[in-house]
Amino acid sequence: MLKLTKRADYGLIALKHLAESETGAASAKEIGDKYQLPPEALAKILQRLTKQGLLVSQQGTHGGYSLAKKATQISALEVIRAIDGDVFLTSCSSVAKGCDQHEICTIREPLRKVNNSIRGLLSRIKISDMRDAAGDEADPMETAITRAESHAVQDVRELVTLGEERV
């Protein structure tokens, strides 16, 4: 099953929260308390996002974290990569010969296309999409994905065509 790690979930939640914040900043404690996230894990994630240039950290009594760029300029893919490294559906997507079946594999190319499509979709989902979808009655992530997909109809058509060719 393809799914995000809890660390990536927490990072996306934190960035969405910062994008929604009236002041544009929040402490790790404020974010952790609001979403019931483990404080130690969240602190490490926020430090990593700061080190990767997605957040800015302010010290002091009124310190906290804020977005280093506009919410429209930060993608879900950037956040996930900053926390967990690159996104791969299969091990052979990341290493040329990372599989015993490398020489005879018949699904490497279709899976590479699926992997690239997933990366493409994640790169089109912006923190602003997640923020703006928060008030929708539908699932906010579904709404963000729908918005991103509207910009990616061609990718979906290519996948459908690939599937039809294989049948």
Where are these regions (language model features)?
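Residue cluster at the C-terminal edge of the helix-turn-helix DNA-binding motif
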Residues: 51-54, 82
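C-terminal regulatory/oligomerization modules of transcriptional regulators
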Residues: 96-167
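N-terminal helix-turn-helix DNA-binding core of bacterial DNA-binding proteins
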Residues: 2, 6, 10-37, 56
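Conserved segment of winged-helix/HTH DNA-binding domains
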Residues: 71-96, 107, 111-117
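Alpha-helical residues within the helix-turn-helix
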Residues: 33, 50-51
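Beta-hairpin "wing" of winged helix-turn-helix
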Residues: 53-67
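Residues within the DNA-recognition helix of helix-turn-helix
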Residues: 45
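Key DNA-contact positions within bacterial/archaeal DNA-binding proteins
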Residues: 40
